[in-house]
């Protein structure tokens, strides 16, 4: 048992050693890989990015600005010369002292050439030597430009005015002072062309005088811009004003006066008035009694009826309290009868059918109102319409009307209409 047990124990020890060794190897492998990854990331961050070939070619090719750039004085390209002297500069190259010196020398040459150019020009801005290229000069189109250029040439000799820029600035300021708007510009040019060269004060004063009336020698466009358009506007405004006044008159015209419609029983006032005059002239009681005893009949029932009797039936009303004999002045039209009733206070609309008399009642002054007594004696001859209105007022006041010794009870409108065939006295409404 002894040697066998020792062999088993040694085998177990070897197995444990192998297991521990393998675990240590695996741990070391993972540790080494982790460290390698860390180092690789550090190297990538420290190393500069490598550009591709296409990118390098694009960076090395000179740009269009370098190829076609010109200096202020020379007509040749300076970029090509500098590239030939210094060579092609690539990314990352360090300029040497020689290259910096050449660049400084080139910059000094440019400065001296600019100064020489300024010296070559005289005080008026014109070049002393012949230039191969000159800008064309625009000829003056009108007399105003000639005046302004002459004034600018006179002011060139001043101490503060040197060079073309100041001259142009002075002339532009004078133009702005003389000509402020389009219409003044057109008038200034035409005025100078007609009258010749003149002062600025004269031209401005003439402009103010010529604003209202056009000159005969002006062109069509100037007249259209300043005169004809205003005429058209005035013409259209006048036409609109005339139309507007006509429309206003039509709108403000009062409504037509309504036509007065007479009562059905008073549609023949003239014939009724003639009958009353005939009755007053004849003075016969039998004839008037016949008129009063008429009830509405036709010729078939009574063939002895005349035209006057028939017209009296349809144009007369039987009313109690009226006498058959009436003088001529008492038989008046409904309008005159209603006009005589202006003194009655607070008359209802049903008391008189005349609309105009109702309106005139309120328009008249109290001095012109002819007041009438509230009650009349039986011997007096009342007017027909006044009696009808007085009867209605008495009905409202509940005062009994006594006529010819008979007591007339209070009656309604229907009863008064029914009494038209029964009463004996004929009156006119």
UniProtKB/Swiss-Prot annotation:
Residues 314-317 are annotated as: Interaction with CSK. The modification Phosphoserine is found at residues 52, 63, 226, 351, 379. GO terms for molecular function: SH2 domain binding. Residues 46-68, 393-413 have a biased composition (Basic and acidic residues). It is a single-pass type III membrane protein. Residues 1-17 are extracellular. Residues 46-69, 113-134, 263-350, 364-429 are annotated as: Disordered. Residues 39-429 are cytoplasmic. It holds the Pfam family PAG. A lipid is attached at residues 39, 42 (S-palmitoyl cysteine). The modification Phosphotyrosine is found at residues 107, 165, 183, 224, 314, 356, 386, 414. One of its GO terms (cellular component) is plasma membrane. Palmitoylated. Phosphorylated by FYN on Tyr-314 in resting T-cells; which promotes interaction with CSK. Dephosphorylated by PTPRC/CD45 upon TCR activation; which leads to CSK dissociation. May also be dephosphorylated by PTPN11. Hyperphosphorylated in mast cells upon FCER1 activation. Residues 113-124 have a biased composition (Polar residues). Keywords: Adaptive immunity, Cell membrane, Immunity, Lipoprotein, Membrane, Palmitate, Phosphoprotein, Signal-anchor, Transmembrane, Transmembrane helix. The keyword Iron-sulfur does not apply. GO terms for biological process: adaptive immune response; intracellular signal transduction; negative regulation of T cell activation; regulation of T cell activation. This is Phosphoprotein associated with glycosphingolipid-enriched microdomains 1. It comes from Mus musculus (Mouse).
């Amino acid at each position: 048992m002894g040697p066998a047990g020792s062999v088993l124990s040694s085998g177990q020890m070897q197995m444990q050693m192998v297991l521990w060794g393998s675990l240590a190897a695996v741990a070391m492998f993972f540790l080494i890989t982790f460290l390698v990854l860390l180092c690789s990331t550090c190297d990538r961050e420290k190393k500069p990015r490598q550009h591709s070939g296409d990118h390098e070619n694009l960076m090395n090719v000179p740009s269009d600005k370098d190829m076609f750039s010109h200096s202020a004085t020379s007509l040749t390209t300076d970029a090509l010369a500098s590239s030939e002297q210094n060579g092609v500069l690539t990314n990352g190259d360090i300029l040497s002292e020689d290259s910096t010196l050449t660049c400084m020398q080139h910059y000094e040459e440019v400065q001296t050439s600019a100064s020489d150019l300024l010296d070559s020009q005289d005080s008026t801005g014109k070049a002393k030597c012949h230039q191969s290229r000159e800008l064309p000069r625009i000829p003056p189109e009108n007399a105003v430009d000639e005046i302004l250029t002459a004034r600018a040439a006179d002011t060139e000799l001043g101490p503060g005015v040197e060079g073309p820029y100041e001259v142009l600035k002075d002339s532009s300021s004078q133009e702005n002072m003389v000509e402020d708007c389009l219409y003044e510009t057109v008038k200034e040019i035409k005025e100078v062309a007609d009258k010749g060269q003149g002062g600025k004060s004269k031209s401005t004063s003439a402009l103010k005088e010529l604003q209202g009336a056009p000159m005969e020698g002006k062109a069509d466009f100037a007249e259209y811009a300043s005169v004809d358009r205003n005429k058209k506007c005035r013409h259209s405004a006048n036409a609109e004003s005339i139309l507007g006044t006509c429309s206003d008159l039509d709108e403000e015209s009062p409504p037509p006066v309504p036509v007065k419609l007479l009562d059905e029983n008073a549609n023949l006032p003239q014939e009724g008035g003639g009958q009353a005059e005939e009755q007053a002239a004849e003075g016969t009681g039998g004839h008037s009694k016949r008129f009063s005893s008429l009830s509405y009949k036709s010729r078939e029932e009574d063939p002895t009826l005349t035209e006057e009797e028939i017209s009296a039936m349809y144009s007369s009303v039987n009313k109690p309290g009226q006498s058959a004999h009436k003088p001529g002045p008492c038989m008046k039209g409904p309008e005159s009868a209603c006009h005589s009733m202006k003194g009655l206070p607070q008359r209802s609309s049903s008391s008189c059918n005349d609309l105009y008399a109702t309106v005139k009642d309120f328009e008249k002054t109290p001095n012109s109102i002819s007041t009438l007594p509230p009650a009349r004696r039986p011997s007096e001859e009342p007017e027909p319409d006044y009696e009808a209105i007085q009867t209605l007022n008495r009905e409202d006041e509940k005062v009994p009307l006594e006529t010819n010794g008979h007591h007339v009870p209070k009656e309604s409108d229907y009863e008064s209409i029914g009494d038209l065939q029964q009463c004996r006295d004929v009156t006119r409404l």
